[in-house]
């Protein structure tokens, strides 16, 4: 019984303590909360008063600005009037000075010393007096013409419409249309003559031809001194507009468009009517698009235009690329998932730090640069040889590696800056693309005199690369093969090898000595040339990926699945050279083993990119690899 009473008392004491704890401090806290609300109310009231005061000040400033604009207009008109008055006054002053000079000469030449004027002097003075009004009128007439030209060409003039021009044969000048005036009505494109005769001289052509020409009319007027007839000769010629190089290349046409093919005269490929991405996507990792309604305006990556509020847009779940529904087929491929973080120092990490864990393992900056270069750079002379602006390259690199969204490379005017960005990224990696460990293997494979053994050794070295390096190298080689096949760039395999040799091959150690650097500089281009000589089918296999865990309703596939440029056939099989007993006597002992290794790496049972799926998917069938349902 005592134990029960003791337990009940303990429970009662605990309840009392808890009630005291709960009752303590509540009033103080509520009072403090009320005081805080009162402080915020007062601040809100003060802010409201200040807002009203600033609105009044803004209205006063707008009124003052309007008044000052009116005053400025009147001041400009007054300045024009004063300029004309000054010109007339200067002309009158010059005339009076000439008359005074004539009178001075007349008086100084008089040697008689007589105070009275002779008859000749009186007649001369009378002539000057009579000729003054006529000369003044003539001078005013000439000056009025000069004033008209001056008012039209004056930079300080307020009225600059120039919409009405009076045709005057006395105005002789050669005038070329400015860029601003080309966009106005056609009636203003004729300056030195009526528009009627000029229109007859123009040949009837397409709208494109008319839009690329301007009319320049030259009129020469000859006025004889003896009062003979006045002769006028007019010539009319068409001059093409000056265009920037970016407008020639920035048409945003894909690589496999018909118009681009006709101009480049490349090897034949599959023709399609739909617009595709700059490279094929057969077997590539495709975008996993989801539709959303735009709340905050965003920019479409393929076309660069803004997607306005309330419009429907598509966004990839992996790489966060945003596009219009009609631009989905032009999004860059392959789809590279966006990284959560970047290395501490921009651009100075390992290549694996810039790629995701899904295949193909290619840095996003490489994919976007290559796609933009192939869209509008394959007609640019000296691609990758001409350097871009260092400041632009640095800013783009910051945006790619620091900002979560993808910067719009289509808004970069200089395509060489994008090329420099790609080279700068690959050059500033802590380890080159071909790695320090395999540097010597690649150089030794490139220097093998026998072509079959050299290619087999190159296959072996590529197969030993880390997956990120191998995938990036394959993507880059496919791109450089396209650049080499374009005749407009004037960058063949040898030139590209000289440019990319130090960038992707580099050296076997981080800080080589000068002697090693000189030796490697001669060997690096050979490695790139040998890599570019490998067939396109070999590099394309690394771009193929099994589409796992992707909703088929979201898959958007390009119809141009097999439209990449064809690489010329080489003289060696992918599985190594065909040998005979006599031929094997001339080979090195390692050639057969290298060929056997290449043969084993190219079998169809080899897993691609370390796929996590348990069942192998047949990627060797013909046609498209994935279904292409339309997005609803």
From Swiss-Prot:
<dbReference type="GO" id="GO:0000281">
    <property type="term" value="P:mitotic cytokinesis"/>
</dbReference>
<dbReference type="GO" id="GO:0005547">
    <property type="term" value="F:phosphatidylinositol-3,4,5-trisphosphate binding"/>
</dbReference>
<keyword id="KW-0862">Zinc</keyword>
<dbReference type="GO" id="GO:0007405">
    <property type="term" value="P:neuroblast proliferation"/>
</dbReference>
<dbReference type="InterPro" id="IPR008936">
    <property type="entry name" value="Rho_GTPase_activation_prot"/>
</dbReference>
<feature type="modified residue" description="Phosphothreonine">
    <location>
        <position position="588"/>
    </location>
</feature>
<dbReference type="GO" id="GO:0045995">
    <property type="term" value="P:regulation of embryonic development"/>
</dbReference>
<dbReference type="GO" id="GO:0030496">
    <property type="term" value="C:midbody"/>
</dbReference>
<dbReference type="GO" id="GO:0001669">
    <property type="term" value="C:acrosomal vesicle"/>
</dbReference>
<keyword id="KW-0539">Nucleus</keyword>
<dbReference type="GO" id="GO:0005654">
    <property type="term" value="C:nucleoplasm"/>
</dbReference>
<dbReference type="GO" id="GO:0030218">
    <property type="term" value="P:erythrocyte differentiation"/>
</dbReference>
<feature type="modified residue" description="Phosphoserine; by AURKB">
    <location>
        <position position="410"/>
    </location>
</feature>
<dbReference type="GO" id="GO:0009898">
    <property type="term" value="C:cytoplasmic side of plasma membrane"/>
</dbReference>
<feature type="modified residue" description="Phosphoserine">
    <location>
        <position position="628"/>
    </location>
</feature>
<dbReference type="GO" id="GO:0051233">
    <property type="term" value="C:spindle midzone"/>
</dbReference>
<dbReference type="InterPro" id="IPR000198">
    <property type="entry name" value="RhoGAP_dom"/>
</dbReference>
<keyword id="KW-0206">Cytoskeleton</keyword>
<dbReference type="GO" id="GO:0097149">
    <property type="term" value="C:centralspindlin complex"/>
</dbReference>
<dbReference type="GO" id="GO:0007266">
    <property type="term" value="P:Rho protein signal transduction"/>
</dbReference>
<dbReference type="InterPro" id="IPR046349">
    <property type="entry name" value="C1-like_sf"/>
</dbReference>
<keyword id="KW-0813">Transport</keyword>
<feature type="modified residue" description="Phosphothreonine">
    <location>
        <position position="260"/>
    </location>
</feature>
<feature type="modified residue" description="Phosphoserine">
    <location>
        <position position="203"/>
    </location>
</feature>
<feature type="modified residue" description="Phosphoserine; by AURKB">
    <location>
        <position position="387"/>
    </location>
</feature>
<dbReference type="InterPro" id="IPR002219">
    <property type="entry name" value="PE/DAG-bd"/>
</dbReference>
<feature type="modified residue" description="Phosphoserine">
    <location>
        <position position="600"/>
    </location>
</feature>
<feature type="site" description="Arginine finger; crucial for GTP hydrolysis by stabilizing the transition state">
    <location>
        <position position="385"/>
    </location>
</feature>
<feature type="modified residue" description="Phosphothreonine">
    <location>
        <position position="606"/>
    </location>
</feature>
<keyword id="KW-0175">Coiled coil</keyword>
<keyword id="KW-1055">Congenital dyserythropoietic anemia</keyword>
<keyword id="KW-0360">Hereditary hemolytic anemia</keyword>
<feature type="region of interest" description="Disordered">
    <location>
        <begin position="582"/>
        <end position="632"/>
    </location>
</feature>
<feature type="modified residue" description="Phosphoserine; by PLK1">
    <location>
        <position position="149"/>
    </location>
</feature>
<feature type="modified residue" description="Phosphothreonine">
    <location>
        <position position="342"/>
    </location>
</feature>
<feature type="modified residue" description="N-acetylmethionine">
    <location>
        <position position="1"/>
    </location>
</feature>
<dbReference type="GO" id="GO:0032467">
    <property type="term" value="P:positive regulation of cytokinesis"/>
</dbReference>
<feature type="modified residue" description="Phosphoserine">
    <location>
        <position position="206"/>
    </location>
</feature>
<keyword id="KW-0217">Developmental protein</keyword>
<keyword id="KW-0493">Microtubule</keyword>
<dbReference type="GO" id="GO:0048487">
    <property type="term" value="F:beta-tubulin binding"/>
</dbReference>
<dbReference type="GO" id="GO:0043014">
    <property type="term" value="F:alpha-tubulin binding"/>
</dbReference>
């Amino acid at each position: 019984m005592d134990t029960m009473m003791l337990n009940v008392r303990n429970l009662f004491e605990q309840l009392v303590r808890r009630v005291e704890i709960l009752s303590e401090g509540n009033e103080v806290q509520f009072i403090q909360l009320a005081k805080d609300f009162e402080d915020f109310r007062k601040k809100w009231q003060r802010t409201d008063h200040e807002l009203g005061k600033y609105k009044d000040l803004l209205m006063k400033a707008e009124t003052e600005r309007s008044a000052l604009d009116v005053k400025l207009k009147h001041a400009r008109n007054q300045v024009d009037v004063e300029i004309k008055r000054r010109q007339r006054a200067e002309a009158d002053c010059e005339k009076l000075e000439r008359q005074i000079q004539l009178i001075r000469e007349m008086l100084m030449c008089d040697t008689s010393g007589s105070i009275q004027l002779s008859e000749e002097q009186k007649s001369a003075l009378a002539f000057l007096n009579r000729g003054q009004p006529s000369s003044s009128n003539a001078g005013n007439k000439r000056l009025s013409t000069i004033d008209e030209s001056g008012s039209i060409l004056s930079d300080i003039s307020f009225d600059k419409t120039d919409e009405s021009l009076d045709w005057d044969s006395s105005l002789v000048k050669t005038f070329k249309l400015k860029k601003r005036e080309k966009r106005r009505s056609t009636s203003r494109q004729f300056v030195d003559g009526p528009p009627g005769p000029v229109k007859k001289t123009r040949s009837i052509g397409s709208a494109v031809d008319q839009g690329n020409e301007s009319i320049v009319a030259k009129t020469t007027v000859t006025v004889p001194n003896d009062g003979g007839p006045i002769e006028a000769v007019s010539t009319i010629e068409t001059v093409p507009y000056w265009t920037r190089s970016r407008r020639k290349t920035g048409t945003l046409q894909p690589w496999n468009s018909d118009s681009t093919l006709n101009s480049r005269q490349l090897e034949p490929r599959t023709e399609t009517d739909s617009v595709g991405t700059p490279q094929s996507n057969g077997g590539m990792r495709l975008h996993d698009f989801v539709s959303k309604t735009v709340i905050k305006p965003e920019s479409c990556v393929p076309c660069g235009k803004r997607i306005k509020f309330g419009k429907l847009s598509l966004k990839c779940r992996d790489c966060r690329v945003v596009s219009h529904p009609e631009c989905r087929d032009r999004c860059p491929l392959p789809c590279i998932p966006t990284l959560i973080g970047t290395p501490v120092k921009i651009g100075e990490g390992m290549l694996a730090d810039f790629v995701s864990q899904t295949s193909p393992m290619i840095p996003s900056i490489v994919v976007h640069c290559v796609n933009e270069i192939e869209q509008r750079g394959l007609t640019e002379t000296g691609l990758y040889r001409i350097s871009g602006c260092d400041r632009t390259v640095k800013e783009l690199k910051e945006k790619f590696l620091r900002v979560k969204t993808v910067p719009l490379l289509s808004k970069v005017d200089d395509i060489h800056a994008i090329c420099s960005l790609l080279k700068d990224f690959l050059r500033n990696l802590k380890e080159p693309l071909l790695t320090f460990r395999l540097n010597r293997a690649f150089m030794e494979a490139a220097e093998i005199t026998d072509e079959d053994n050299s290619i087999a050794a190159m296959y072996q070295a590529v197969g030993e690369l880390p997956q990120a390096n191998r995938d990036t190298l394959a993507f880059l080689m496919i791109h450089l093969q396209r650049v080499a096949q374009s005749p407009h760039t004037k960058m063949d395999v040898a030139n590209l090898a000289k440019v990319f040799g130090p960038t992707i091959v580099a050296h076997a150690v981080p800080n080589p000595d000068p002697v090693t650097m000189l030796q490697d500089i001669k060997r690096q281009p050979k490695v790139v040339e040998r890599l570019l000589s490998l067939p396109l089918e070999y590099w394309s296999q690394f771009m193929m990926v099994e589409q796992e865990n992707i909703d088929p309703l979201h898959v958007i596939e390009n119809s141009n699945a097999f439209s990449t440029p064809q690489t010329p056939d080489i003289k060696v099989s992918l599985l190594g050279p065909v040998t005979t007993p006599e031929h094997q006597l001339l080979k090195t002992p390692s050639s057969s083993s290298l060929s056997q290794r290449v043969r084993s790496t190219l079998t169809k049972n080899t897993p691609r990119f370390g796929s996590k799926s348990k069942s192998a998917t047949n990627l060797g069938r013909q046609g498209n690899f994935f279904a292409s349902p339309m997005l609803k």
